[in-house]
Amino acid sequence: NVKTSRPQHLTAKQVISKTAKHFQIETEEICSSKRSKHIVIPRQIAMYLLRSELHMSFPKIAKELGRKDHTTAIHSIEKIEKDSKLNPAIRDNIASIRESLYN
């Protein structure tokens, strides 16, 4: 197994775009205020990936995704961390998006 290192050129926009593409939704929907489940989960996963892959601060993550308050990012990331331990589909989605970011 070859461990891939994070490319220096990876941006927040790329993470958001790849997440949207994976879930077959528009990038604008991830950044919107819509609360339907098929948009909320990809948004939360995008926040999680921005934190884990780009090591962004909570306020910066919130700003990237059009959120007013960084506590939304904290809650979302904690939720995905918890859910990924219980739900293999969440883990698989995260792994698939990560793979698309690095290949």
Label every model-predicted segment.
Residues 28-103:
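Terminal-proximal interaction/regulatory segments of ATP-powered molecular machines
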Residues 1-39, 52-53:
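AAA+ P-loop NTPase domains with strong preference for DNA replication initiators
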